[in-house]
């Protein structure tokens, strides 16, 4: 019975793609898609690449649509890129090669948030996340 429950829970995890996160991005700001809003607070999966971290061995990292060799948000005048999601992991993350594709699973948080420790501002986050390398 326990295996069936686990399988059912895993089957219900929605796979969110970067293309479906936002409905629009205008001068008035980002508008989240109905798919993103419906997944708020739920366990979801996303696929992408780990951006180079702000500091090594932290409990968070940034998931990007495409591999990046430099920090995608370090410019002081940068606006929030639509192709990144902040990942707060269950445990300390040791950075992996930026060109290795990963799948992340965690609880989706939607809306502006300022990290009290780093001051990092995010629009979308996955909490209690875990990741694995994929091909």
Language model: regions and residue ranges:
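N-terminal signal peptide c-region/cleavage motif recognized by signal peptidases
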Residues: 4-6
């Amino acid at each position: 019975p326990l295996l069936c429950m686990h399988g059912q829970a895993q089957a219900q995890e929605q796979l969110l793609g970067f293309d479906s996160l936002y409905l629009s991005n205008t001068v008035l700001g980002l508008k989240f898609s109905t798919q993103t809003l419906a997944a708020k607070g739920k366990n979801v999966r996303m696929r992408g690449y780990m951006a180079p971290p702000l500091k090594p061995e932290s409990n968070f990292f940034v998931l990007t649509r495409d591999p990046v060799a430099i920090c995608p948000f370090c410019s002081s005048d940068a606006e929030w890129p639509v192709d990144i999601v902040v990942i707060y992991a269950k445990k300390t993350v040791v950075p992996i090669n930026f060109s290795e594709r990963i799948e992340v699973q965690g609880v989706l948080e939607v809306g502006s948030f300022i990290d009290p420790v780093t001051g990092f501002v995010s629009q979308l986050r996955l909490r209690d996340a875990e990741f694995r390398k994929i091909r």
